[in-house]
Amino acid sequence: MAPTPDRDGQDKKVCLGVVTGAHGVRGLVRVKPYTEMPEGVAAYGPVETKDGATSFAISLKGMAKDLVICKLEGVDDRDVAAALRGTELYVPRERLPRASGDEEGWYYADLIGLRAVGLDGRDYGRIAGVENFGAGDLLEIAPAEGGQTVLMGFTDENVPEVDIAGGRVVIDPPAGTFGDDAEAERGE
């Protein structure tokens, strides 16, 4: 699931997907899901915009390649649907099941804002996002020294530890990932 930076105790929301455009002329929308199963985008009740200003009842109408086709209540024509392009759809975290696969139980959204720390303790920056462009999950890291974010494969080898309670993700980046040779010790 996609990120919602929220480390200050506010009600945490999790982004289930983003509207990519209109589908047809009756107000259906195409949604890129961030859920493990694409149909999960409509499985947790009404969705809302990031700022919480607008809420929609959502229902799944079909699939189109890697997108889901959804009906958002109150969106009844193509122009309104098209205007929603880029709108992220959120639900309150408490509506989601406990995350599995780890004794801590975390979602990708929980990683946003955590420190990215090397095996040697080096501060690489903060996790800015988790992306997937089709070839696997990538951590987007905002470097500690500033500049452009860096994408790194989110694999067991590159990310040996996620420590939510400690506020950090331990990384072992491949050589050259951060534009220097400090990672060359890894032997790559």
Curated annotation (Swiss-Prot):
Domain PRC barrel: 103-177
Single GO MF annotation: ribosome binding
Compartments, as annotated in UniProt: Cytoplasm
Cited InterPro entries: PRC_barrel-like_sf (IPR011033), PRC_RimM (IPR056792), RimM (IPR011961), RimM_N (IPR002676), RimM_N_sf (IPR036976), Transl_B-barrel_sf (IPR009000)
Family annotation (SUPFAM superfamilies): PRC-barrel domain, Translation proteins
GO cellular component: cytoplasm; ribosome
Signal peptide region: none
Single Gene Ontology BP annotation: rRNA processing
Record keywords: Chaperone, Cytoplasm, Ribosome biogenesis, rRNA processing
Free-text note regarding domains: The PRC barrel domain binds ribosomal protein uS19.
Function: An accessory protein needed during the final step in the assembly of 30S ribosomal subunit, possibly for assembly of the head region. Essential for efficient processing of 16S rRNA. May be needed both before and after RbfA during the maturation of 16S rRNA. It has affinity for free ribosomal 30S subunits but not for 70S ribosomes.
Name by which UniProt lists this protein: Ribosome maturation factor RimM
Gene that this polypeptide is encoded by: rimM
